[in-house]
């Protein structure tokens, strides 16, 4: 019943519910990599670039302002049909503290929606579209062509002595995510996407300390801005909060090489079973080419879209 309803609605579902619906109708055991987290995740990893460069099948299953209970149940939902080798967890979501009472309510809500999925989908017949129609979804990634330069301090990752502590309920759910990945033979990779507005050394230090203590791989791309070739005058859509598609392409190119060097994933590009990915990637390239002119104009004039 759940599969039928979601399959019928998937093309109409947008916003926070879309990843749940879309993951439900993805062919079984076809995804190599899942990317979870808040909006930093799905604005930073271009699924079609990873496919075109490395033949890696990726789904961005993040949600705007996704909280850690949502992350956990999103991944638990995904593991019902998928066997990804890697789960990337974007770390900005690990600092969302909603308070003890609200966090308890959040946990109960997410648990209920996971075990009784009709609660999640019961309003989808009258879904309100909250994404602009012009944005096409590519396995969770959406091309963002806005340009709004970051004009803050370039040394936003300057070392600080103190750490910023993760909320306790976040640590509980992070451990549950670790256990979930281990149970499903997926390697957990913590990644901090470049974001001067959201990230700093205090947060980096906290995640690094946690990762070292747990033996989890942690990659902070805020420490690699020059290596990535990021230009904060051109590669952000909203003054350093999120990357635009130019920034996402640079980050994804780096991630693809990093994954190739550190993990063993099969290249599916010549596998006829995955021909739909080649077709979607071609559509992505055509769409990307059509908007590059607009971005170039924005870069030259210094005015965002």
Label the model's feature ranges:
Residues 35, 60-64, 161-167, 191-197, ...:
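Second-shell loop/turn segments in exported
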């Amino acid at each position: 019943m759940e599969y039928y309803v979601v399959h019928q609605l998937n093309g109409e579902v947008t916003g926070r519910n879309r990843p749940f619906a879309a993951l439900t109708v993805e062919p079984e055991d076809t995804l190599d990599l899942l990317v979870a987290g808040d909006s930093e995740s799905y604005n930073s990893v271009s699924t079609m670039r990873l496919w075109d460069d490395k033949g890696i099948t990726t789904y961005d299953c993040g949600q705007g302002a996704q909280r850690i209970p949502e992350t956990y149940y999103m991944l638990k939902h995904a593991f019902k049909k998928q066997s990804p080798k890697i789960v990337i967890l974007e770390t900005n979501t690990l600092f969302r503290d909603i308070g003890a009472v609200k966090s308890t309510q959040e946990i109960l809500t997410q648990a209920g929606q996971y075990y009784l999925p009709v609660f999640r989908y019961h309003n989808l017949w009258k879904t309100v579209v909250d994404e602009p129609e012009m944005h096409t979804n590519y396995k969770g990634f959406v091309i963002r062509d806005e340009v709004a330069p970051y004009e803050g301090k370039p040394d936003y990752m300057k070392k600080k002595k103190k750490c910023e502590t993760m909320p306790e309920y976040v640590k509980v759910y992070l451990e549950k995510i670790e256990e979930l990945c281990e149970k499903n033979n997926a390697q957990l990779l913590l990644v901090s996407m470049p974001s001067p507005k959201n990230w700093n050394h205090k947060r980096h230090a906290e995640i690094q300390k946690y990762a070292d203590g747990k033996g989890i791989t942690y990659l902070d791309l805020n420490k690699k801005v020059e290596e990535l070739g990021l230009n904060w005058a051109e590669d952000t859509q909203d003054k350093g909060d999120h990357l635009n598609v130019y920034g996402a392409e640079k980050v994804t190119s780096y991630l693809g090489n990093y994954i190739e060097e550190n993990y063993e994933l099969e290249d599916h590009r010549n596998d006829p079973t995955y021909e739909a990915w080649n077709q979607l990637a071609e559509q992505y390239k055509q769409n990307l080419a059509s908007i590059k002119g607009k971005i170039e104009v924005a870069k030259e004039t210094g005015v965002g879209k």
